Amino acid sequence: MKKEKAPLGLYIHIPFCRQKCAYCDFYSLPSREDKMDAYTDALIRHIREVAPRTESHRVDTVYFGGGTPSYLGAERLRSILRAVMKGCPVTRDAEITLEANPDSACDIKALRTLRRAGFNRLSLGVQSADDGLLRAIGRIHTFAQVQQSVTAARKAGFRNISMDLIYGLPGQTMQQWEDTLSAVIALAPEHISCYGLKLEPGTPLYERRLEETFPDDDAQADMYLYAVTALEQNGYGQYEISNFAKPGYESRHNLKYWRMQEYAGFGPGAHSDFGGVRYAYVRDLDGYIGGRLILSESESDATLARDYEYVMLSLRTAEGIDRRYFETTYRQRFQPMEELLVQYEQAGLACRTENGWRLTPRGFLVSNSIIVALEDALAQQKLRREQAVASGNYRVI
């Protein structure tokens, strides 16, 4: 009998969009019926090829991301999910998420088709409740459509709805951000993500960065801290830097990334960490449709710095770093990092947990700097150990 491995997550990339947003650098292309049919066939073929490798796992999360998966249409999405369920050991309680734009999620009939097919979590790209701000960043929906999509989704049977918001938008005021949070909270989604705007090179918003007026760093910090307080006061616990959920509605799929669990990706640009190898497919729709599954990157466990990665990812979460787990798993002393964490604790940026350390909301704001400092302390410890081994003075502590 094969030994059952830890549960596996599946990520399925749908690269089609009605219109690319001004800030987006994800791999996405204009929607075309002929391409969508061919792509659906290619995905199903790829899923069938990989399915035998999942037999010793339980697949407990499936995530359709993009792009805008909802533009693929309910029937195509249903056929892809059917291939997943037929070929992979998907658990009865699996979390199956579909990303959607509000303008494409107002059709109750289509939503019912998706719900009956097995989708049970809907993630809506809301971004703002201010229609003027939505137009400024190239979004094609209105907040009225957000409200309509929530009503339709509830009627279709969705009991788990997530909404993405962005702060730091061009010209955005604190009042607009507060109003957005109030409007979204009133819709009672189970999960809310709040992301600071990132100006990615090559995007229209990046090219216009000198023409636009953006909230400065202090203003964005105030927006973030306001969101943390407002959401927690309304029953949304913060479980990761940008993510908040009602109890029991944390994104199980995204937790796999932060907990360094295995996931397999399908589609051009999709990433995987599966079978001891991390890899990604090239961003080439036509090549993928033609069956050319070319990797853009690939690393084995032997070359990955998992200890550094654990520090980086765990400090993104409310769980934080588990001291004993770190020392036993990576055979590294925690003390050099703990000395720094004590200093961060005194500054109000970190706090102790039952098993180790986590960052505070203010610590999350400067998490990149903190993580770099901790990883540098870890690197210095490794260097000292290597020097001790070379000199013959090393002993296990």
Report residues per predicted region:
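Flexible, acidic/Gly-rich N-terminal and inter-domain linker regions that tether
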Residues: M1-L8, R18, R45, A347, ...
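Conserved N-terminal Rossmann-fold NAD(P)-binding element of oxidoreductases
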Residues: I12
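Local cysteine-cluster metal-coordination motifs and their immediate loop/turn environment
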Residues: P15-F26
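Short amphipathic alpha-helical interaction segments
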Residues: R331-Q343
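A short, conserved structural fragment
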Residues: E345-N355
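Minor-groove-contacting beta-hairpin "wing" of winged helix-turn-helix DNA-binding domains
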Residues: G356-T360
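Short, amphipathic alpha-helical interaction segments positioned at domain boundaries
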Residues: F364-I397
